[in-house]
């Protein structure tokens, strides 16, 4: 909670207020009115993708080893970001995913998961984090027998990506984290269980999400939504100036009074604010007035529109592809086809190629992704395979 003190003085000079005691009223004494603006706010903390060695062999991703968890939280809390990612996942997965093998095409592991489910999961991680991980398990004969999707936020790596560490919870201190260590997948080795790891960043240990330049924009949309939620929680009530006329308390007592008002009468965030005034007597007190606040609707509308546009720009995507209309309401089939063709070439097909090449490297099988189509009709030349 941020507290701002402001002093309104009746003349240029005033008698200093004695700290840590209630100030008595004296005749003809010039008394300052001390206003404490109770400004509740959500602390914006944009986590940076720093990399630093730990004593356990893996490289920490983020100062507290929580950068991927931060990205995941933005994905879950920012509707525009989630819409872009989920829509693009649909485009990448296409209408059908097939492996040129009867057994593999029916299931990829003992959970009876289909190839399409694996492609959907790893394409989502590529879009969220810039990388993905697959647990490759060999059978007793030494051949690849199962593939398991590993949520990328649960993986950490050593510096050169030859050893990987899996944990369901990296939030604990390094010494208390329980993890499983895996070697890097090598088609020429017979490791019983290993990790295939893909990163779009070949110079660092960890990848870079394609929307990393728009993290601040995602944070803006999240915070604006929090503001409106807190406005609802506060009943859209206007701010008030509350005058307490029994003297000016010391700072400790003033803080306690503030906390009591906040706990009982306000919600969290910036949706509603209280301003509390302390004065020696009624003669020197401020009047109790409802404080007019600016209509924030229009102010935040332009802000959130710009934030959304930055997110679409980061993905090189057109909002109309994801059901979000733009100022130009006209978007006919021809325009849709042209827009999708461009997005398909610049974003969708490159990721499809990464996935098919990766699965081909692991399985030594041909992987085919039939492109996304609204009418379920695809030209043979559009099929992505490796």
Residue ranges and their predicted role:
Residues 2-280, 385:
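Structured, contiguous alpha/beta core segments that scaffold functional sites
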Residues 200-358, 368-373:
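A contiguous, surface-oriented mixed alpha/beta subdomain in the mid-to-C-terminal portion of proteins
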């Amino acid at each position: 909670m941020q507290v701002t003190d402001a002093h309104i003085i009746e003349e240029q000079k005033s008698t200093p207020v004695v700290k840590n005691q209630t100030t008595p009223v004296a005749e003809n004494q010039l008394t300052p009115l001390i206003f404490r603006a109770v400004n509740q706010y959500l602390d914006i903390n944009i986590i940076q993708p720093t990399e630093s060695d730990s004593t356990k062999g893996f490289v920490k991703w983020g100062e507290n080893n929580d950068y991927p968890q931060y990205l995941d939280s933005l994905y879950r809390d920012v509707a525009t970001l989630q819409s872009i990612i989920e829509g693009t996942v649909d485009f990448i997965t296409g209408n059908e995913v097939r492996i040129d093998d009867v057994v593999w095409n029916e299931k990829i592991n003992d959970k009876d998961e289909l190839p399409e489910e694996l492609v959907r999961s790893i394409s989502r991680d590529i879009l969220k984090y810039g990388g993905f991980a697959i647990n490759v398990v060999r059978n007793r004969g030494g051949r690849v027998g199962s593939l398991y999707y590993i949520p990328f936020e649960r993986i950490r790596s050593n510096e050169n990506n030859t050893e990987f560490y899996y944990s369901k919870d990296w939030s604990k201190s390094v010494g208390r984290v329980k993890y499983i260590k895996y070697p890097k997948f090598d088609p020429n080795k017979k490791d019983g269980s290993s990790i295939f790891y893909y990163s779009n960043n070949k110079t660092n240990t960890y990848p870079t999400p394609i929307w990393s330049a728009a993290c601040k924009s995602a944070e803006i949309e999240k915070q604006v939504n929090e503001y409106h939620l807190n406005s609802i929680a506060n009943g859209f009530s206007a701010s008030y100036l509350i005058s307490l006329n029994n003297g000016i308390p010391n700072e400790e007592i003033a803080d306690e009074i503030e906390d009591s008002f906040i706990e009982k009468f306000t919600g969290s965030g910036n949706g509603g604010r209280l301003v509390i005034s302390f004065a020696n007597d009624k003669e020197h007190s401020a009047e109790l007035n409802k404080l007019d606040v600016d209509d924030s609707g229009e102010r935040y509308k332009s802000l959130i529109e710009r934030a959304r546009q930055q997110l679409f720009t980061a993905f090189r995507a057109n909002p109309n592809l994801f059901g979000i209309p733009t100022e130009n309401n006209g978007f006919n089939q021809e325009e849709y086809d042209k827009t999708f063709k461009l997005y398909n070439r610049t974003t969708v097909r490159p990721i499809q190629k990464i996935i098919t090449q990766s699965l081909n490297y692991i399985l030594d099988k041909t992987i085919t992704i039939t492109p996304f189509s609204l009418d379920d009709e695809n030209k043979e030349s559009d099929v992505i395979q490796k």
